[in-house]
């Protein structure tokens, strides 16, 4: 019995250490989507945008622009090129385009707290005020080095920077970039990671083996 427990323990450790995690984003590469005005903000010419499925027209998520100099059009279909941790192919930030422009921690924090409806808890944001949406868009552009001044979003920038510079700061949100190739890349968020199927099979096999062994011992 002791030997079997040791085997199961090894399987469990391998399952957690060796296997990866899957982030269930609302869209994936090759999905076709379109944009529409969410009715919030847009005094900036940027977000907030609604993203809808081009086939069934379901609302998938709401988002904000990352690249100031690239554009999209409403009610026009776009094919998702991929989901990554950086923007590619545009913007004013003169980084190596092949390497892309990684998302800043402050941008991730702002968008995650916006999506989870936590951004108003510090009296930084009013979900019923268009000016708050415009401020958030300006803050995102500034944090991604797309504009030289955050303007009305400066207070969001400073607050987010203070948060992520704290020595005890940790971030468990799932924020990435929806890459659209030559068009405007957008922020996207997903839920907490879930184990891959291979992980579940490995763990299940170990537990099943333990149950089988115990039954044999009891006979």
PLM regions with names:
Residues 1-8:
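Bacterial N-terminal signal peptides that target proteins for export
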Residues 18-24:
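Sec/Tat signal peptide C-region and signal peptidase I cleavage site
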Residues 9-17:
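Bacterial N-terminal signal peptides
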Residues 25-191:
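Short, surface-exposed polybasic-aromatic patches that bind anionic ligands, especially phosphate groups
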Residues 216-219:
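Short, charged juxtamembrane terminal tails flanking transmembrane helices
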Residues 195-213:
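A short, hydrophobic C-terminal helix/tail in secreted or cell-surface proteins
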